[in-house]
């Protein structure tokens, strides 16, 4: 069990040292690092949402269809919002988006239908909404990172590679339960913000250096 956990931890943090790699077109460049961990995190959120809703409503094609429809709708709305915002407003909005995503994922972890003082149908509706809501904020984060990418092909390659590793990370639910995927995906999404912080620091240094 210890070896299993160590290997999965290595998979999560493997791309971190490459954050400061200089080549901007490399698969290991900062922009690709963000896309990589975004792919990992989204895979975990998708797995958690599908699993929890299947446990609540039954593992049927109707439940799977509702989950897929919800994901596509929320992703579309997120992309629509990003398209309507200019780069400056989008950049200023990112701290709020990361903050709301953190709040929703923590609610996902701590909240359960049994803890809500409502009839079973209402409690399940609320937990379903909270389970799917992170996709909206995830879509905004993904689109904003992709919008900044200097090489879209490399960014998508890194994202797909992250999805592959995310498929491996799904096995962590064997150790910590399905709800633990919320915390792991939150960690990965916060890691995706590191290049943004680094970029902001570099921009501030350049601005200070100007006469």
Can you annotate each of these PLM segments?
Residues 1-211:
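Alpha-helical transmembrane segments of multi-pass membrane proteins
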